[in-house]
């Protein structure tokens, strides 16, 4: 698996599913930003939708925001044609949050299907979000 893919997948789960309590390299942050910008353009997010995505506000997502999530997940390989790529998730997310927590997330989330691939991506985001690490306490 090439380093581009590893970085992309790591950035995906941190920015969309895991939250910001993990540290990303500058390269990972840049790659995630590139994917966000490309997907925003591809699905033609409105300025209001872009603001929601940037604020990580995925409550009551529009169809465009759901398709943005699908685009992002597909760019990094965790979804392919609406199907979760479990081996990829286990290998890469496991390195970030631990194998056991990743297996628990997959057990809960693997059967999720939406009305279409965009809806599936949005529902998977919601499912994986429940496994994100608690924020670290500030001293």
Curated annotation (Swiss-Prot):
Its main location: secreted. The keyword ATP-binding does not apply. Disulfide bonds join 39-71, 67-118, 109-127. One of its GO terms (cellular component) is extracellular space. Expressed in ventral pits of larvae. In adults, it is not specifically expressed in chemosensory organs. Also expressed in stalk cells at the proximal tip of the wing disk. The keyword Transferase does not apply. Glycans are attached at residue 23. GO terms for biological process: olfactory behavior; response to pheromone; sensory perception of chemical stimulus; sensory perception of smell. SUPFAM superfamilies: Insect pheromone/odorant-binding proteins. Keywords: Disulfide bond, Glycoprotein, Olfaction, Secreted, Sensory transduction, Signal, Transport. One of its GO terms (molecular function) is odorant binding. It is found in: Secreted. Residues 1-19 form the signal peptide. InterPro entries: PBP/GOBP, PBP_GOBP_sf. Belongs to the PBP/GOBP family. PANTHER family: GEO07291P1-RELATED (PTHR11857:SF43), ODORANT BINDING PROTEIN-RELATED (PTHR11857). Present in the aqueous fluid surrounding olfactory sensory dendrites and are thought to aid in the capture and transport of hydrophobic odorants into and through this fluid. This is General odorant-binding protein 56a. It comes from Drosophila melanogaster.
């Amino acid at each position: 698996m090439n380093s581009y893919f590893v970085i992309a997948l790591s950035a995906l789960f941190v920015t969309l599913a895991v939250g910001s309590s993990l540290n990303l390299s500058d390269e990972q942050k840049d790659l995630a930003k590139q994917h966000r910008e490309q997907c925003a353009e591809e699905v033609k997010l409105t300025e209001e939708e872009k603001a929601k995505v940037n604020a990580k506000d995925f409550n009551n997502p529009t169809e465009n925001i759901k398709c943005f999530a699908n685009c992002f997940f597909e760019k990094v390989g965790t979804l392919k044609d609406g199907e979760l790529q479990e081996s990829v998730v286990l290998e890469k997310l496991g390195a970030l949050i631990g194998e056991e927590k990743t297996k628990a997330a997959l057990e809960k989330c693997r059967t999720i299907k939406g009305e279409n691939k965009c809806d599936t991506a949005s529902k998977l985001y919601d499912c994986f979000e429940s496994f994100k690490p608690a924020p670290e306490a500030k001293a």
